Amino acid sequence: MSIISIEKATILDAEKLTELMTKTFDEEVKRWLYGQGDVIDYNIQPPGYSSVEMMRYSIDELDCYKVIMDEKITGGIIVTISGKSYGRIDRIFVDPIYQGNGIGSHVIKLIEEEYPNVRIWDLETSSRQLNNHHFYKKMGYEIIFKSEDEYCYVKRITVES
């Protein structure tokens, strides 16, 4: 089994992370928006997803991690922590050639371990990305809102006393 870890990203990682995020989200466009040229879905194509400058901003201003598998960067996760107990998964991406191997599940667990005081995690995903719905439910997230374009999920972590 491959070793999967997360490390805080640095400015030196910005180009590689941008390359992987662009590859990942462009694949999602092909899968979920094929033939729908006029559709804009900001969960499938988040603003700035292909911009190295935006990745540098994320690294400087947010909690941005690179996903490492077998000493190679294979993805990333960007989170925002508000206060001590609230976290938001802004973006998670895994190189499409490595998807389906449990990397995303492992990364979510690692992020939860990285922030043990966070009791509420939330995120949004496109209503079109059916694989994401299955993934987030598997990870313990519950739908709190859905519209024609977007699903909002939350995960509440209870502390055993």
Label every PLM stretch briefly:
Residues 1-15, 19, 159-161:
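Conserved N-terminal entry element of GNAT/NAT acetyltransferase domains
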Residues 25-54:
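Conserved GNAT-fold acetyl-CoA-binding loop/helix
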Residues 66, 72-81, 88, 93:
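Conserved beta-strand in the GNAT
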Residues 81-92, 99, 117, 149-151:
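A conserved beta-turn-beta hairpin within the catalytic core of GNAT-like acetyltransferases
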Residues 94, 100-113, 134, 138:
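Conserved acetyl-CoA-binding loop-helix of GNAT-fold acetyltransferases
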Residues 108, 129-132, 149-154:
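Short glycine/proline-centered loop/turn elements that form peptide/ligand docking sites
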Residues 114-127:
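Conserved GNAT acetyl-CoA-binding A-motif
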Residues 116, 137-147:
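Conserved acetyl-CoA-binding loop of GNAT-fold acetyltransferases
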